[in-house]
Amino acid sequence: MKRTDSTAKATAPNPPLAPLLVILGNTGSGKSALALKLAREIPAGIVNADSRQIYSQMDIATAKPTPAEMSEIPHYLYSFIQPDQPFSLAEYQSLAYQAINKLHTQNRLPILVGGSGQYLKAVLEGWSIPQIAPDETFRAAMFEKAEKEGGASIFAELVKQDPQAAAKIDPRNIRRVVRALEVINKTGAEFSKLQTKNPPPYRVLKIGIHLAREELYRTVDLRVGKMLEQGLEAEVRHLLEQGYAATLPSMSGIGYRQIAKYIGGEISLSEAIEQMQFETHRLIRQQNTYFRLADPDIHWITLEESMDSGIINLVRNFLADGGKE
């Protein structure tokens, strides 16, 4: 019997999903170096997933790729907004999808690189993010309350209004707590109820670089000294002289906040260094809540393995499996 058109359509194979490579891990683990290594071997482009590397004029403490590296390989979402420019997670997600899709049209493999768990999850899980404009008056009031009464005071308010959201937000992340309260205040709905997921049509390979915690601590401690040698103090002074306030969200990043305090005479240089190292260690522990060794979706490798040719073969096989490359 002749098959109908509808039957033929029903049995037609689905088109192959577009590939996406993700390189993740702790700060200082060598993600950018691995991305560059792969992009030199396989037609690719690099998409930033680090919430600190989006800002222009803030290069040293954020450990961005160098201008030479960015001119050699296509890079997206680096240094594209000013330090005082508001920028939301929803905006990042939209721009990341645009960059990924653009690379696909160029027959390049998109490599999403970063250690900002929220950025990565928003893209990979397809979060539906509330499109709520910032309420600067509300934010100022919340930040003032946190300053006077401690961050626990506003986190307690979030626990009261939306316990599900509070369970997923680090109470030390004041900006995220304030954002959740802001959305609740403007919509009258629980923040957690407004976040749904619709994963994008990508075939994903996640590669994580793992270093033992003590080894990673030593690496980032040495990197703090190197940042100062590279001119971090001058970079922060230049930002302050241009009128960028030390209280800006962009200036809350590790390195900028502490050096701004040193420049302002609040702490000594040695205290600034100690605080930078302490905060980086804390960031590493926080990142470990996003990037778990037990996660079966992540192909974990050591730093030594990231330098080996085997990692290139892994990516080539991933592309070949989907009929890409």
Curated annotation (Swiss-Prot):
Kindly list the positions annotated as binding ATP: G25, N26, T27, G28, S29, G30, K31, S32
Please give the SUPFAM superfamilies that the UniProt record associates with this protein.
Answer: P-loop containing nucleoside triphosphate hydrolases (SSF52540)
Q: Which Gene3D superfamilies match?
A: 1.10.20.140, P-loop containing nucleotide triphosphate hydrolases
Reaction catalysed by this chain? adenosine(37) in tRNA + dimethylallyl diphosphate = N(6)-dimethylallyladenosine(37) in tRNA + diphosphate
Report the record's Gene Ontology biological process terms.
Answer: tRNA modification
Which InterPro entries does the record associate with it?
Answer: Dimethylallyltransferase, IPT, P-loop_NTPase
Keywords, A to Z, come to:
ATP-binding, Magnesium, Nucleotide-binding, Transferase, tRNA processing
Write the protein's name.
tRNA dimethylallyltransferase
* Quaternary structure and interacting proteins, as annotated: Monomer.
Q: Which residues bind substrate?
A: T27, G28, S29, G30, K31, S32
